[in-house]
Amino acid sequence: MNLENRISNWLKEYLFNHKLDSFVIGVSGGIDSAVTSTLCAMTGEKIIVVIMPIHQNPNQTNFGLNHCNWLKNKYKNVDIVEIELSSSFEELKQNIPIKFHDDLSLANTRARLRMTTLYLI
C-alpha cells in the first residue's frame, strides 16, 4: 500500500473511531490545504472544503477554488462552501482599539476567524 493510501485509511479510521460524519477543511490555495483536502477526499467519506477569503488577492482565492472544483470533479464526496469573511473581519477590527492593530495581531486574527468559522461548520 502506498503512502497516500495509508494516510487516507488512517484518516478514515480516525473519523470512524471518533464518531464523526465528515471532514471540514479550510482551503487557502496553498499546498498544505491542497494535500490535506485531497487525502481526506480519497477516504470516500464526506468532506466539506471551505474557502474563506479575507481581503485576499483574487489569484490566491482562485488557486483555492480551482483546487476545490478539481476535487469535486474527481471525488463525489466533496462539497464546496465559500464564505467571504472580509466584512466580519472589518467589524471585529472596528471594535478593537487601533493601538492594537499591528500586522502580526491582524494576521493572527484572520487565522482565528477562519478557525472559528470552520468550527461552526
Regions found by a protein language model. Give the residues of each.
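ATP-dependent adenylation/nucleotidyltransferase module used to activate substrates
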Residues: 1-121
